[in-house]
Design a protein with these regions (language model features):
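His/Asp/Glu-enriched, well-ordered alpha-helical/loop segment
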Residues: 148, 220-282
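Divalent metal-dependent hydrolysis catalytic cores, especially in the metallo-beta-lactamase
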Residues: 29-58, 68-78, 110-124, 152, ...
Length: 282
């Protein structure tokens, strides 16, 4: 059975503005069903959505049993006002508002909390993020509150300091995880945090002509080196494509190939352990 631990049903892999516009009035069942059919045909039995504020992931969860798929969603991902994430998530101005938004997601049937606590990679410049991560104490409080409310936490997080803070708070999964150092890898391992590296968002950019090839190759190589180190430590890894992101179509199988390049012959055993942890936590 194939699994994808990070998708966005609201997006289509081509035009994020157009994709969101498609569902802005209400989730479009025809699109969602076609996408679920694709996953079913490819043998996917478990999907974990990264969330959206228009209810598309929520509707996909309702329809997924028709296709024999276990579907998990946070409903709306939560981000700090004025920082990365507001294009798809609900911005929050205070921790009090954060608690309110968690409550609203709970009423909508959320399975877990998704927080966005850093910027994203600049695919033209190796080592550069679009913005720094949130302060460590704030990250720790966001994770603590969600756990206190009974939810596991999925965190969009890049950069070593951001991931260290999240892992110290025992975040349940880290998504992306670009530019980590040994301290960050050890912190995730010790916390039992599952790393979902979404290599497809990098590897699928090669040869497209949109970004600097040298930078893309360097970013991918860095991520794969860190994955190998994390696996050697006994860290938990799970496959997630970030399907719906540009050049990452729904049903993409590239993640398994890219993880295999990094992890070698142990890839299946390593991913089985990580997937078991994801399904237990989420």
């Amino acid at each position: 059975m194939n699994c994808d631990c990070h998708i966005h049903m609201v997006l289509d892999g081509a035009d994020w503005r157009g994709a969101i516009a498609r569902h802005r009035e209400k989730p479009q069942d025809a699109f969602i069903r076609r996408t679920l059919e694709t996953y079913q045909w490819l043998g996917f039995g478990y999907l974990r959505d990264g969330g959206d504020r228009w209810g598309v992931g929520k509707r996909a969860k309702e329809l997924a049993p028709d296709y024999g798929i276990v579907y998990r969603t946070p409903c709306a991902p939560l981000c700090k006002a004025g920082h990365y994430g507001s294009f798809i998530g609900e911005p929050l101005a205070s921790l009090r508002e954060y608690r309110v938004l968690i409550g609203e997601n709970r009423k909508n049937g959320a399975d877990f909390v998704k927080i966005m606590i850093s910027g994203l990679m600049d695919f033209n410049r190796f080592g550069v993020l679009s913005e720094p991560g949130l302060p460590g104490e704030e990250i720790r409080e966001l994770v603590h509150i969600a756990h206190e409310e009974g939810f596991s936490v999925m965190a969009h997080a890049n950069g070593a300091e951001t991931v260290i803070a999240a892992a110290e708070a025992r975040v349940d999964s880290v998504e992306h995880g670009a530019y980590l150092n040994e301290e960050a890898l050890h912190a995730m391992k010790e916390a039992g945090t599952v790393w979902v590296p979404t290599l497809s968002t990098i590897g699928n950019l090669r040869g497209k002509g949109r970004f600097q090839e040298r930078a893309v190759e360097a970013i991918l190589a860095s991520a794969q080196e860190n994955l190998a180190s994390f696996a050697a430590m006994g860290g938990l890894l799970a496959p997630g494509t970030d399907a719906g992101a540009w050049a990452v179509p729904h049903g993409s199988l590239t993640e398994y190939a890219l993880l295999g390049e990094a992890l070698g012959s142990r890839v299946d055993d390593l991913l089985a352990k990580g997937l078991a942890a994801i399904r237990e936590k989420f």
